[in-house]
Amino acid sequence: SKAFELIDHNALRRKFNDYGFPPQLSLWMLAFLSRRNQFVKVGGCVSAVMRSHAGAPQGTRAGPNVFKLLINDLSFQLPTIKYVDDVSVVSVASDPNDQTLQKAVASLIDWSNRNGLRMNNDKTKELTIIYFGRRHLVSDVPELTVGGISIERVCSFKVLGVIISQDLTWKEHVLYIVSKACKRLFIIYQLIRSGISVADVIAIYCSLIRSVLEYCSPVWHC
């Protein structure tokens, strides 16, 4: 949600022009996004009204599309996985001192600065996988840095709900989803005790538990 709040309207205006949007459509979209008033209401208390000078309203169909338009030109000479405000960059190298990925990180920072966005350092991780003979150790690979600060190196990381481990096994992911499903089984138990119908129990099971166990199963169930 934070990323949606940081959409720079001036950067968006440039994107509209770069992609050849009709002037009328560009003006209409910018008018929809700009000068929006907002306030917070809790019970009978209402905060002062503030005007938003950036961002896109959430809960609208236009919001996600506007954000995708903003990040559409974010690309590198490396495989890049983008999903809304999540970006993963992948590099394969035979030399542990290869600087390709570090250059991609620098390009990402430069792109973010030009487009009025900022990278969340707390959520930015480095996952290094050594394979094919394991002639090198992870410690042989220089750490990636952002502004002179090292990016945290982890042994596993969750990408779109799937935990990828350094050893290329799915043990951690399987333990994670089994634990998550077991916690939700308690809900089923309580519903059965309350006398809910079997059909409703099955529907809730499929929605809350089976969906967790089957999510991306073609990837990790191998």
Question: What is the meaning of each model-derived region?
Answer:
Residues G44-C45, A93, K103-A106, R118-C155:
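Short, conserved micro-motifs composed of acidic
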Residues D98-G116, C182:
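Inter-domain linker/hinge segments that demarcate the starts of reverse transcriptase
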Residues F16, M29, L70, L74, ...:
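Structural preference for long, well-ordered alpha-helical segments in enzyme cores
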Residues P64-S91:
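Active-site palm subdomain of RNA-directed nucleic acid polymerases
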Residues A31, K68-N72, S207-Y215:
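Short, residue-level hotspots on alpha-helical faces of the histone-fold
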Residues F4, V40-V66, V90-S94, R153, ...:
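Short, conserved non-catalytic motifs in the polymerase core
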Residues I81, G148-W220:
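Basic, alpha-helical interaction scaffolds
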Residues S1-P57, S91-V92:
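Conserved pre-catalytic core of RNA-dependent polymerases
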